[in-house]
């Protein structure tokens, strides 16, 4: 179960109430009155915990679990241990996420790191022209610049700087040591520690006798329900804006260049870099360490495998991989042929044998 020093659960709940709140069903209606006090993995859960099984790889852990209750797909119901009450869901992991949010709402929406919510710490600095909504939390060392607007119930973490003119919507969590400049953030945005948003894009007119800096005159627009992982960077536009679409989730250590436009619901995994003026459609997935060159389009629903190097436009709904990135079936065939070639060379067989 979660360490109570860091993660304090809300009040215990009955399985009947949980099932109702997440839109799932109990395998046995008589279990509706059973109480659980929190969530935990299958291998560490106790009799008062609720767990889940989503990946069949963990079926053995499910058969041996001491959890009091478990969320499972109906196909696993008949093989459940006798001691485990079941909540049935076609999407167990999603259902578990909803339950974990119920028990730990602060973790789902950002937890302040110092003091109580709704307080402005005496060591926070707020410009007289800034406008703060009700219930705003400012932690020690926060600086709020001229003309800044912050929505209701937003938390700004320790030593974070919000530059002049920026706006932050309601119910946001901006973690410690973040810098925001030239940026507008929507509602329910979560920004993890160390993120940099709105700094200069990397723009230079290159040549002799020296490289001339091009003033970056755009902004960063972060729409509602976006999450940006620790130590990621989002450069402001050179003239057009850099845009992060609604519901997009960005992992740690991601670089997003100037003028990039990212659609709704995209997933961008750690150490990915997106060069300037590239456009991503809706629900694009970029796996870890993907590199994307500038001035191209990755259309909606496309997926790029880890370490892929995207140098051309990617059609909608396609899976690409490799260096340079290509349709994933083609890339896999190339990998197989290279392995065959390597074996032939080691054995001294000619390639056409």
From Swiss-Prot:
One of its GO terms (molecular function) is N-acyltransferase activity. The active site is at residue 258. Pathway: Bacterial outer membrane biogenesis; LPS lipid A biosynthesis. Its EC number is 2.3.1.191. InterPro entries: Hexapep, LpxD, Trimer_LpxA-like_sf, UDP_GlcNAc_AcTrfase_non-rep. GO terms for cellular component: membrane. One of its GO terms (biological process) is lipid A biosynthetic process. The keyword Transcription regulation does not apply. Gene3D superfamilies: Hexapeptide repeat proteins (2.160.10.10), MurE/MurF, N-terminal domain (3.40.1390.10). Keywords: Acyltransferase, Lipid A biosynthesis, Lipid biosynthesis, Lipid metabolism, Repeat, Transferase. It catalyses: a UDP-3-O-[(3R)-3-hydroxyacyl]-alpha-D-glucosamine + a (3R)-hydroxyacyl-[ACP] = a UDP-2-N,3-O-bis[(3R)-3-hydroxyacyl]-alpha-D-glucosamine + holo-[ACP] + H(+). It comes from the Bacteria. Catalyzes the N-acylation of UDP-3-O-acylglucosamine using 3-hydroxyacyl-ACP as the acyl donor. Is involved in the biosynthesis of lipid A, a phosphorylated glycolipid that anchors the lipopolysaccharide to the outer membrane of the cell. Belongs to the transferase hexapeptide repeat family. LpxD subfamily. Homotrimer. This is UDP-3-O-acylglucosamine N-acyltransferase. The gene is lpxD.
């Amino acid at each position: 179960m979660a360490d109570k020093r860091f993660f304090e659960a809300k009040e215990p709940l009955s399985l009947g109430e949980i099932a109702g709140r997440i839109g799932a069903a109990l395998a046995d209606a008589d279990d509706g009155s059973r109480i659980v006090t929190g969530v935990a993995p299958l291998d560490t859960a106790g009799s008062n915990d609720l767990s889940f099984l989503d990946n069949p790889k963990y079926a053995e852990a499910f058969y041996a679990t001491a959890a009091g209750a478990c969320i499972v797909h109906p196909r696993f119901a008949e093989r459940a241990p006798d001691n485990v009450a079941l909540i049935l869901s076609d999407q167990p992991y999603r259902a578990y996420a909803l339950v974990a949010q119920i028990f730990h709402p602060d973790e789902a929406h950002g937890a302040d790191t110092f003091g109580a919510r709704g307080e402005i710490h005496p060591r926070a600095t707020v410009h007289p022209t800034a406008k703060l909504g009700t219930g705003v939390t400012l932690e020690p060392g926060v600086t709020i610049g001229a003309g800044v607007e912050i929505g209701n119930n937003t938390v700004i973490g320790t030593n974070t700087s919000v530059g002049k003119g920026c706006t932050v919507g309601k119910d946001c969590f901006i973690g410690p040591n973040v810098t925001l400049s030239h940026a507008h953030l929507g509602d329910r945005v979560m920004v993890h520690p160390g993120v940099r948003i709105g700094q200069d894009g990397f723009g230079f007119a290159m040549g002799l006798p020296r490289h001339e800096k091009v003033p970056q005159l755009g902004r960063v627009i972060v729409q509602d329900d976006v999450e940006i992982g620790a130590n990621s960077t989002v450069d402001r536009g050179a003239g057009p804006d850099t845009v992060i679409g609604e519901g997009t989730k960005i992992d740690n250590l991601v670089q997003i260049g100037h003028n990039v436009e990212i659609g709704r619901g995209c997933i961008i995994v750690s150490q990915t870099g997106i060069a300037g003026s590239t456009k991503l459609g809706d629900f694009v997935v970029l796996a870890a360490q993907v590199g994307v060159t500038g001035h191209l389009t990755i259309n909606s629903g496309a997926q790029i495998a880890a370490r892929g190097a995207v140098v051309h436009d990617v059609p909608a709904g396609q899976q690409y991989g490799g260096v340079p990135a290509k349709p994933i079936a083609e890339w896999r065939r190339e990998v197989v042929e290279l392995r065959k070639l390597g074996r032939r060379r080691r054995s001294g067989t000619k390639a056409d044998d």
